[in-house]
C-alpha cells in the first residue's frame, strides 16, 4: 500500500530471477555486511599460509569490517574475541609483546591493565558498545589504541583504512534504497515476505568477481569486493543471496536466561543494505551538507533511536554537538534520504508513541538468529554467540545472546534459527546467496518453553501479591484447641503447631494476637449475664482475610477503626433487598460476627467476606451514634429507673445495676459523673484505678475500660464538649459527690430552682442561670480562638497544638477560622459577629449540661424541662 511507505520488509530477489537489464556489481561499502557464522575450532586450526593467501585475495581495496572487534596491524586478521586475537598474535607474530599499554583515544586514558580499561569504559562510556582496539608499536612498545567505531545506520561498523577507501565509502554509502523508489518495481516480488530465514547448510559457488574470503573469526563479516572505478553514481547493484536448504526452526522468546543478553537498540526502519539494492546519490549534491556530522557518535546514536527528532531534541543536539540547528536538520534529512526513510506525520507520531511507550507492532515479525559453533577453547567466555538481525518495525531490540535457543525479548516475536554449517561448508563457502523462504514456520507454531523458576515462584506464593492464603478447617481447629488451652502460646507450642498445621511462625503468632484482640473486644462490648457463655468463644479467625474487622460492641462507637486500613474506603456494589434482609436479620440476632455466621452469610447472600464484614462494621457505627444520642437524652432526665421500652434490641450494654433486669445495661448519671471526673484526672488509669472505679461505681471493669477507650477517641477528635467544663472546675470538690447526690434522688425532676447541697460548681451554675447579666460563660472553641486573635492578630504555628486542645477543634478548622479572620480584615468588614458568638456560647452550655449527667440539683434548660414534665404526667 502506498501510504505505508515506512514498510521495512526488504524485497527479496532470487538469484535465478534477476533482471537481465540490471548489471551485477559488487560495490565496496554498499551497506552493512551479512553476518556469517564461522566455526571457532576451525579458526584455531587454520595455518598462517592460509591467512596470507586470504590477504592476497583481498588486495582489491577490500575494507574489512568487524563489529566491536580487534584488528591486527601486521596482517588482515580481525576478530571480536580478545582471547582469539591474543592467540593469533602469539602464534603468527611471536615477536610482538602483548603485555603492553592500553590507550583510550577519546579520553587520553592510559593504563597497563585491560581490566582498568574496562572500568574506564563503564565509567566514562556507559552504554557504548562500539569499541575497537588497534594494536600499534611506538618506540618499541606495544600499545592498544581504543577507538569508537564509525557507526553506519544499519548497525555495522566501518574502519576506513585510507583516503581512497574513504572516498569510495562516501560514494557508496550515499545510495538511496531502491525499495523506496519506483525503480524497485522492476525487481519486486509479488509477495513481500514478513519473515526471512537465512541458512548456511548448503552454499553455491558464485561468480569469481563476487568472491569473498571467510575469515576464521567467531563472527566474521562477509563483504563484496570494491566496484570498478568507472562505476557511475546511478548504477544499481544487487546483493548476493544465501540459498536455504532446510526448513527453519522457530523458537519462542518466552524463555529468558537473565543476565546473558547484551542489548543494543536497533532502528528497524534500517535494513541490511546488502539485502536492498540502492540508487547511488552523492551526498555532496545536498546544499549546506556538513560531512563532518557523519562521524559524530551523538548524532548517529540519536538517528538510530528515531530518525525524526523533535525541535527540542534538535536544540539539545545542537548544544551538545556544537553544530547549528540548521546543519543538524539538514543532516537528519540527508540520512533519511540515504536510507529511504519517508514517513507521513501521522506515521511519525504513531511510531514515536509506540516506541516510547513500549508498544510493539502487531505485524508478525521475525528475527534471524545465526548461531556459531561451541568454542573448544578454554577462554572462559560464553560458549555461544548469536547475532540477531532484526527485520521489523521501529522500537524493537537487537540482542546479542549467550546461550542456546534463548532470546530476552519481551514481545511475542518469532525467532527463526538457521542451521549450523558444517566445517567443510565453512571452508568451501565463498559468498552464499540468500533468498526468501516460503517454508518459514509461522509464529504460532513456536515451540512452547517453560517459564523461569523465579516467575513460577512468584505466582505460586500469594504473599508476593499481598494476599494471605486462607487457613483450612483443620488448621483452624488445631489453632482453636491450642488457644483454649493458652492464649499466649510458648515457643514449644508454636513449633508443635507449625509441624501440625504447616503454617509459619509469624502466621501462628498473628492468629493468636488477632484472636485475643477480637475476643477482648467481644467481651468488653457485651452485657454480662449469668447464662451468657459467649466469652469463651473464639469469635473469628482474623487471618482468613487480609484485613479483619474488630467485633465492636454496638454502643462503643469505634469510629477510629477502618476495616481497610491500608487502602482508601472501598465501595461495594449495591446489595439486593434479599441480601439486606438476611444481613439485617443476622445483625439483630447478634451484632458480633462469628466465623460460623460469616460462612453462613457468605453462602446465603453470595457476598464476599469483606462485603459482609464492612456492612456489619458500618451498621455498628451508625447504631452506636444513635445510641449515644439516646443515652445523652436519657441521662439528662436524671431518672434512676431503666426505660427498657424506649430502647431497641442490641443497645449498648454495660454491667447491670443491682435492680435491673433484662439485657438493658445503662450507666446512671452518678456513674457517668464519676467516670468523667476520673477521665479528666487521667486518660489512662492504672489497673488499681480501674479496680477502684469499678468498686465505687458498681460497673463492670470491662465496661469502664471500654468507656475510657471510646472517650479517649472522642476527645482526640474533639467531640467531648463536657471535657473543658470538668477540667475547669475544681476536681477535688467533684470527687466525693456520689453519696451526696444519692440522698436527693427522690426529689421531683422538675422542682424549682434551689440552692444545691454539697455542690459548689453546680451552685455556681444555678445561681448564674438566675442572675442573668452576671452569667459566667465558659469559653467555647471560637471564643478561645477570638481571644488569641485579639492578642496576636495572626496564627502562630507553634501555638496550633495548644489551640486545638483548648478549643477541641480540628487543625484544619483552626486554620480556616484564622484564614477567615484574615480575609475579613483585608476586606475591611467586621471580624466577629457578636450575636452569633453569644448564641454559640449559650448553646454550648446547654449541650454541656445535657452531657454532664448531673444530679437532680441541676436545673435543665427549658426544652428539657418540657420533656421531663410530659414524662411525669
UniProtKB/Swiss-Prot annotation:
Pfam families associated with the record: Homeodomain, Homez, zf_C2H2_ZHX
PTM sites of type Phosphoserine: 45, 47-48, 202, 648, 774
Composition bias type Basic and acidic residues, residue spans: 212-221
Biased composition (Low complexity): 223-236
Keyword Nucleus: yes
Keywords, in A-Z order: DNA-binding, Homeobox, Isopeptide bond, Metal-binding, Nucleus, Phosphoprotein, Repeat, Repressor, Transcription, Transcription regulation, Ubl conjugation, Zinc, Zinc-finger
Region of interest (Required for dimerization), residue spans: 272-432
Positions bearing the Glycyl lysine isopeptide (Lys-Gly) (interchain with G-Cter in SUMO2) cross-link: 159, 441, 454, 485, 629
Gene that this polypeptide is encoded by: ZHX1
Residue spans, zinc finger C2H2-type: 70-93, 102-125
Acidic residues bias spans: 18-30, 831-857
Transmembrane intervals: none
Region of interest: Required for interaction with NFYA: 272-564
Bias (Basic residues) ranges: 740-764, 863-873
Location of the protein in the cell: Nucleus
Protein name, as recorded: Zinc fingers and homeoboxes protein 1
Source taxon at top rank: Eukaryota
DNA-binding annotation, residue ranges on this chain: 284-346, 464-526, 569-630, 660-722, 777-832
Region (Disordered): 1-63, 202-236, 626-667, 732-769, 829-873
The organism's taxonomic lineage, starting at the top: Eukaryota, Metazoa, Chordata, Craniata, Vertebrata
Subunit and interaction comment: Forms homodimers. Also forms heterodimers with ZHX3 which is a prerequisite for repressor activity and with ZHX2. Interacts with NFYA. Interacts with ATF7IP.
